[in-house]
Amino acid sequence: MNVPLPPIVSAQEWEAARLQLRDKEKEVTRAHDALAAERRRMPRMEVDKAYRFEGPDGPVSLLDLFEGRRQLIVYRFFYEPGVSGWPERGCPGCSMMADQVAHLSHLNARGVTYARVSRAPQESIQRLKSEMGWDGPWYTLTDDFDADFGVDEWHGTNAFLRNGDRVFRTYFVNHRGDEALGSTWSYLDLSALGRQEEWEDSPEGYPQSKPYQWWRRHDEYVADIDPWEGSLDEKIAAAQEHVRATTGASTEAPTGASAGPSTGAWSGAPTGASTGDTSGAA
């Protein structure tokens, strides 16, 4: 291979170079965490237009896309007439993005629903999903939702928050910003409430629990559309029973594994969500 490569060094020199880069990587990680904290303090934009979509079972509203959860992430997938590969295939870049999306049960466990939207009819969407092995809800656009939310000409990801029947747009990213998405953590960092873990710098009153303890194998989560409502003890017991039922094991879930803080349920978008309050844990 006639390509100019970096020099060959000893193990000690290699380790020293790696540690230098590690320090820079940690700086980037801390900057990323700080940016996500700012994102959680962005003002919200209320969505007051009644957008309609077509799902596999008929017409649905934007509120329906939440599937009862508090948060929604919507990716604009270009699959429609005029797109490369139509009707057999979807946009190559959007297809690559779909291949990268983590198992959605992990997002659901933090009260986040992930959905795709396209102009293609449902018959074509369901066929493509099956052929490509993609999971998750995928809806047909029927109005100007894509134009209103910046995804009529290019792919992009919008984040929303629900408070009762009111829906708010909380963030939007496209172009290279989309390239960083795919993992559970990347989508949670984009969401209005974040990872909901105690180390995060979030506005006071945001739901948070200990890191690691809520993590599960994707088939071991309790089916729960909102992890922040109900009794903590009840949720832990339900998680233990669910694991026993699905794995045949008698392992106990660690304290705080499947729910939020024992102080009670979070009742909606907290006061001060967009005021720059920095009282959350660092």
Place the predicted regions along the sequence by residue.
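Non-globular targeting/processing and membrane-anchoring segments
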Residues: M1-R110, R127-S130, P137, D143-A282
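Catalytic nucleophile loop
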Residues: N108-I125
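Short loop/edge segments at beta-strand edges and connector loops
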Residues: S118-R119, T140-T142
